[in-house]
From Swiss-Prot:
Binding locations of substrate: W98
InterPro entries: Flavodoxin/NO_synth (IPR008254), Flavoprotein-like_sf (IPR029039), Flavoprotein_WrbA-like (IPR010089), FMN_Rdtase-like_dom (IPR005025), NQO (IPR037513)
Signal peptide positions (record): none
Record note on cofactor: Binds 1 FMN per monomer.
Alphabetized PROSITE patterns for the sequence: FLAVODOXIN_LIKE
Protein's UniProt name: NAD(P)H dehydrogenase (quinone)
Record SUPFAM superfamilies: Flavoproteins
Classification of source organism: Bacteria, Pseudomonadati, Pseudomonadota, Alphaproteobacteria, Hyphomicrobiales
Catalyzed chemical reaction(s): a quinone + NADH + H(+) = a quinol + NAD(+); a quinone + NADPH + H(+) = a quinol + NADP(+)
Source organism per UniProt: Methylorubrum populi (strain ATCC BAA-705 / NCIMB 13946 / BJ001)
One Pfam short name: FMN_red
Key words of the record: Flavoprotein, FMN, NAD, NADP, Nucleotide-binding, Oxidoreductase
Annotated binding of FMN, by residue: 10-15, 78-80, 113-119, 134
EC assignment: 1.6.5.2
Family: Belongs to the WrbA family.
Length: 199
């Protein structure tokens, strides 16, 4: 049984919803799944002023525990086409893991949210891919065998680089069914590959 970590940062809960959907998919594939988040860096009074979702149930991860999993699926909202600083700050502490080759051969994947359809989804996902390559991870996206990412009949996220959702500039749009389905598919897909690699 593959061990999968869904590690995310979420300001307003969109990525949290996607993380839970990713975890559902990985569990459906038979994986042992943990959902954890990285620490918030925004001062609490500022976070409250901007209505951040501060009641997220997922526990805070430690850098060292990343080595305990067969696959890590990262999630973050985009910040100007890149991962959020909270996630970057966490990842920047993985030098010790890199020095030991602790993540080499593990499966890595990512998902994100943006304010608009063209708000930097794919560049955010590829910012994770660069990190994964440096750690020697096996990078997995969201293949076109997930049919929900095809078509133009509705505004929707998802990309071959990973599952995505569109939140609108004020955060009013919640992840749609097809976006959550994409996240579940990605979780199943990653867990299946991790199980094969773990032997």
């Amino acid at each position: 049984m593959a061990k999968v970590l869904v590690l995310y940062y979420s300001s307003w809960g969109h990525v949290e919803q996607m993380a839970n959907a990713v975890a559902e998919g990985a569990r459906e594939a038979g994986a042992e799944v943990a959902v954890k988040r990285v620490p918030e860096l925004v001062p609490e009074e500022v976070a409250r002023q901007f209505h951040y979702k501060l009641d997220q149930a997922a526990p805070i991860a430690t850098v060292e525990e990343l080595a305990d999993y067969d696959a890590i699926i990262f999630g973050t909202p985009t910040r100007y086409g890149n991962m959020a600083s909270q996630m970057k700050q966490f990842i920047d502490q993985t030098g010790g893991l890199w020095a030991k080759g602790a993540l080499v051969g593990k499966v890595g994947s990512a998902f994100t949210s943006t304010a608009s359809q063209h708000g930097g989804q794919e560049t955010t996902l590829t910012s994770f891919h660069t990190v994964m390559f440096h750690h020697g991870m096996v990078v997995v996206g969201l293949p076109y065998s997930f049919a929900g990412q095809n078509g133009v009949e509705q505004v929707k996220g998802n990309s071959p680089y990973g599952a995505t959702t569109i939140a609108d500039g004020d955060g009013s749009r919640q992840p749609s069914q097809v976006e959550l389905d994409g996240a579940r598919f990605q979780g199943r897909h990653v867990a299946g590959i991790a199980a094969k690699l773990a032997g």
